[in-house]
């Protein structure tokens, strides 16, 4: 920071102290997007219902329900909605005049809690000066009213109304939410995580807490062959190989050829029904065989990690060396194998890749690390994401903090050192950064730790004793499929346990919370997202369509503004086209969690504390120079 003279110091101190007394901006929390771009994009566009609330507050005496719906959708989808309205009937001069006036009023209301400087930075370059005049100099009782009227009239007469309204709409979207928190799992079974990443990269202010599915993509890019196999297997399982081929330019020709030559029809490996597009019969056959091939490659690679990392304590997960013909024996039980596809598994060296398998996985890694679009997305994740974040008296973490049954922190040993609680998650963060920094290394300790984060018992992202992928594919006995959850998930409804976790992460304040994602809230079974008397909140977004029959809703999001915390339960989203055509918003039900006695100000926030330090440092500097 440049050295300031006395006058500049005085100006900066006054500015900082003034900012501290503005209302805190609105934070928007989402999680578990699972590649469902359209639903997520809609939630961003409507601010989890905040824009509709603003429209209703400002115009409830002026507009009927249909008119308010139309105004909302002009804000959500300005290009598409305006084109639709133009096609239905010519939009009159009076319509444009009223619409612009209303949108400017929403902008004015939405910008009240921000400094003029911050709003100016958000203004579109083309209309920056005009909008600043309309926002800050407006007073309909003064002689300037004709001045404002002339600005709007000229915009319409010059044929710029559509463009101006579009800019206003996106400005409202930006002002209504100050900061976005994405609490994990951008990636998974949904078809368009790449579009979500593009959307996030254009967002004005955000942070990301990594989920387990984000981790395997980052790990694959960082050199983990086992995680790379998992990524490809999941894409094949959910009929999303086009994500790799078309969106990330990964050539799967060699893998497909090997799969078709080596594996037979095996219905257990048929891709799940894709809710967005019907796969052709040829695509289904390819996905079925690719899934078999990559599942076996995955088992071999994971066995290699377990063999070279005894301190991971995962030897009980080894399976390929336990196969005897059509049976397998482990945990003192013998089972008959089903859906067998072990053609490339050697009895002598079951975890050794064949020459073709090795060529395929090595080639896939080279392509992953060379894909321009994937590189852009993974760099952005590393720039914005972490395993947890403490922000405004809230601990944001996707999965869990591993606990013992008595609520104490579970300890795990890595490289001869024991880690538990916050230190355990910090260790994993260190391993992530180390592995990402050396992508050419595929079997180093840090890279193997990223795979452990995907499926290890002590992982804060996984939160279970074991991942039963092998059992689900190859054993009929349902009891072997069960994945035992860490005690965290039964203890997180206990205030004492949550308080201990918050203390561990040095989260202070009267209204502190843990905000979790990862686990769908089964509302149909009476489960609540509010745990431990409101100390912990679960906001699994429920965007994945496959979960919605289980949960009964399309998940939760959270808003945290100057008036407190507000949990929002969402109904399912039909489609973008249907929504725009029928003004069909996502139906949301809001529930106030915390409402402080006094309105929260910037000085009560994490950023506010930093601004206060800057002000105090400047004041100290002034005194020293006197």
UniProtKB/Swiss-Prot annotation:
| Cofactor(s) needed by this chain | Mn(2+)
The catalysed reaction is: beta-D-fructose 1,6-bisphosphate + H2O = beta-D-fructose 6-phosphate + phosphate
Which InterPro entries does the entry link to?
FBPtase_class3, Metallo-depent_PP-like
Kindly indicate whether the keyword Cytoplasm belongs to this entry.
no
Q: Say if the entry is tagged with keyword Manganese.
A: yes
Give the EC number(s) listed in the UniProt record. 3.1.3.11
The record, for Pfam families, names:
FBPase_2 (PF06874)
Tell me which stretches of the chain form a coiled coil: none
GO terms (BP aspect): gluconeogenesis
Query: What keywords were assigned to this record?
Result: Carbohydrate metabolism, Hydrolase, Manganese
Q: Cite the annotated pathway.
A: Carbohydrate biosynthesis; gluconeogenesis
Give the molecular function GO annotations: fructose 1,6-bisphosphate 1-phosphatase activity
Family statement = Belongs to the FBPase class 3 family.
**Protein's recorded name:** Fructose-1,6-bisphosphatase class 3
Organism from which the protein derives? Enterococcus faecalis (strain ATCC 700802 / V583)
The coding gene here is fbp
